[in-house]
Amino acid sequence: MKKNDLSPEAFRFEGKMSLKQALPLGMQHVLAMFVGNLTPLLIITGACGLAGGEFADLRVTLLQNAMLVAGIVTLVQLYSIGPIGGKVPIIMGTSSGFIGVFSSVTASMGGGVLAYGAIMGASLIGGLFETVLGFFLKPLRKLLPSVVTGTVVLSIGLSLISVGVNSFGGGNTAQDFGSVENLLLAIFVLVVILICKHSGSTFLSSSSILVGIICGYIAAFLMGLVLPTTALNAEGVAYTKAWVLNWNKVAEAKWFALPQLMPVKPVFDMRAIAPVMIMFIVTAVETVGDISGVIMGGMDREATDTELSGGVICDGLGSSFAALFGVLPNTSFSQNVGLVSMTKVVNRFALATGGIFLILCGLVPKLGALVSIMPQSVLGGAAVMMFSSIVVSGIQLITREPLTPRSLSIVSVALGLGYGIGANNGILAHAPQMLSLVFGGSGIVPAALVAILLNLAIPKDENG
């Protein structure tokens, strides 16, 4: 829809729009975030071993709940309930920033329902912690300039690239990992995404990830018609190849079902809570950046303290609310911030139609089942693009202000020492358990802490 075809009300947050005009604008936002909202769940449930077998129904339920929660939290962010919600034109969804930390928690706890329960327990507590931060946002903002937030975002992206590449090859648990079929399917999805992204069409560009995924499904279906779908492993046992679509799951799923509260019981374990609490500080900073970006880009003004505080509070309580439904933390979606900045459409009702559509999707298990059968290589083709773009976003944040010797030192040491320690757990083998819990596993948490400490410790001067 061209800008000239829109009512002037589309460019006012509280403008009155007809459903006919609002719906396509809301759907554009859903298309921009739909896959990204479900990708973290697909990756973490896979890492926990909850992708198939006896856990197949659980995974469908979690995907269904992810859509429902994203829709509800989006509406709260748009309209607010008291101090909860910033009344800002932002779409909320499942955060990919936690994937690295949750992957390390999963590895340290041996996977399974216990590890996923620990992730839910940590998310529940961490969300409440972020809520408290939302009430004391002013001093927090002063501690976290763009060089710190950029370093953190960069470390998040770096930690996710290997996750995306694993999916690109078919998933590292697949017996045909790295096969020609998996690689070609992933490359095909990536090429489709790139073509759509640079097609010149706003609609195709904003929905490029979803279009790439759909084309990946079609390609996998056609491959199943002309290529062998099974093979023999080294022991001579037959297995189904990772790229094969299991349509039986979709056929067996219901058309309608109410959401299930606490499909996974929260477990409170310090191995998960300690690093996740740090990540929620990072998430609060990201949300501040997203709200600032969407207000400046869409409304041409600075965000108010009330908008920022309400947005972060909604972020925190939304994440705790998500944990009650077995869903990973909810946060603002940066790709939707970019869409608002590009189109200047900030109408609350238009975005709300997208939130309502997500809620309706959350009541349809067949849709969750359809997503759950996505081949890892199809997901990987999209994930490589999504996760690498996070790296670029981090670089853009770091270079928002001229690089000085001070900022270069913060970035270099935070990434080198923080990420290096996180990537080599053995170096903390003789450290106190709490130190190992916070710094071990993912490189995100140590990089964030080192960047914050160096920003406080290194004095500022005229030369930087």
Task: Locate predicted features.
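N-terminal signal-anchor module of multipass membrane proteins
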Residues: 1-90, 97-109
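Hydrophobic alpha-helical transmembrane segments of multi-pass membrane proteins
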Residues: 27-34, 124, 148, 179-183, ...
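Membrane-embedded alpha-helical modules
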Residues: 107-226, 353-464
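Membrane-embedded helical hairpins/re-entrant loop segments and their flanking transmembrane helices
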Residues: 19, 45-87, 274-348, 463
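Juxtamembrane interface elements at the cytosolic ends of transmembrane helices
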Residues: 2-7, 37-41, 45, 188-199, ...
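Short, non-helical or kinked segments that cap or interrupt transmembrane helices
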Residues: 61-62, 84-98, 142-151, 204-211, ...
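Intrinsically disordered, low-complexity non-transmembrane regions of multi-pass membrane transporters
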Residues: 1-25, 229-261, 296-301, 453-464
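Membrane-embedded hairpin module used as a gating/binding unit in multi-pass transport
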Residues: 37-38, 216-221, 225, 232-319, ...
